[in-house]
Amino acid sequence: MNDSEFHRLADTLWLAIEERLDDWDGDSDIDCEINGGVLTISFENGSKIIINRQEPLHQVWLATKQGGYHFDLKGDEWVCDRSGETFWDLLEQAATQQAGEKVSFR
């Protein structure tokens, strides 16, 4: 994958997250902001999830209260380079914990 393809795929991921949070109808207040290629999800309790792109590595990085994760594209899925878990699974787990209620991105 070249850099422009990586950015296109990351932009698609950012848009999917933003659209799902725009449709959020839970009790918790969850906000999403994109600034300079960094997506920040803010929760009512003040906690945040930070998602950014690492162009030199063609990775997506996820920072949560539980820790940091690095994802490589495998087929059509972003997969953690340590655990093998998918981006969506880890994002849902972190968002659910930080929101205090079930958050689904699917």
Swiss-Prot record:
Identify one Gene Ontology CC term for this UniProt entry.
cytosol
What does the UniProt keyword field contain? Iron, Metal-binding
Say which domain of life the source belongs to: Bacteria
Xref: SMART domains = Frataxin_Cyay (SM01219)
What processes in GO biological process is this protein linked to?
iron-sulfur cluster assembly
Enumerate the GO terms in the molecular function aspect. Answer: ferric iron binding; ferrous iron binding
Q: Which Gene3D superfamilies match?
A: Frataxin/CyaY
Pfam families, A to Z: Frataxin_Cyay (PF01491)
> What InterPro entries does this protein map onto?
CyaY, Frataxin/CyaY, Frataxin/CyaY_sf, Frataxin_CS
Function field: Involved in iron-sulfur (Fe-S) cluster assembly. May act as a regulator of Fe-S biogenesis.
Similarity annotation: Belongs to the frataxin family.
Question: What name does this protein carry?
Answer: Iron-sulfur cluster assembly protein CyaY
Q: Which organism is it from?
A: Salmonella agona (strain SL483)
Source organism phylogeny: Bacteria, Pseudomonadati, Pseudomonadota, Gammaproteobacteria, Enterobacterales
